[in-house]
């Protein structure tokens, strides 16, 4: 708040009058001062900041991909020189972040004034992270862009890795957010989800996904998986078909 006030008051001589006019809780003061600081900037810098606000952390390559601005580095340096809450988060000064209060103000403004460009910025960020191999960050931005097709594609690509890393509850929470009609089109992801439910002893949920599997399975899709002989008897066991489970386990 103090830094925001300092930036705002640089262009005003009657500082006492302005300070006395401020009232309300801290967040309201921050929003008010953020608005005043923001309005002092050029339109190009304003848009740059709005686009940058969708990012939880930033670097120049990511900013270039999201903003598509020809002078990304010079504008970023200008923002730093103005003291606009850009903080380095590593010793190499490769990654930065925007102070969370200022970023929240910018992101809310961006979403309220131009939802289409807001989602487009997230979409660009999602594809940049995908190309760099940071799939969890890509999923976050794809969710914010409401690109459900990209979300489920990314999740299917990383589901096995999440299972092997022991992040099974992360996978389940993400899967639960998917429409079942999308999940049913991605059998590898559905397969991994069933295994996660089995491993975490969530039998009711496992049976739910098994029923979904049966609805969409038109052929013996289990043969697509190298560990089919482990899953097939477990499915039968959960379905209380013990003779079938025993027979499959012997194969």
Ranges and model annotations:
Residues 27, 31-111, 120-123:
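C-terminal boundary/linker of central alpha/beta nucleotide-binding cores
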Residues 1-5, 49, 99, 122, ...:
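Generic structural signal for small/hydrophobic residues in well-ordered secondary structure
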Residues 1-27, 43-46, 54, 68-69:
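Amphipathic alpha-helical "lid/sensor" segments that cap RecA-like P-loop NTPase cores
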Residues 34, 38, 175-176, 250:
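A conserved short alpha-helical segment within the catalytic HATPase_c
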Residues 108, 113-200, 205-212:
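Extended alpha-helical scaffolding segments used for macromolecular assembly and cargo binding
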Residues 180-251:
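Internal alpha-solenoid helical repeat scaffolds
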Residues 1-8, 28-30, 101-108, 235-238, ...:
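Alpha-helical sensor/transducer elements of the RecA-like P-loop NTPase core
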Residues 2-13, 53-56, 64, 80-83, ...:
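Short, amphipathic alpha-helical segments that act as regulatory/interfacial helices
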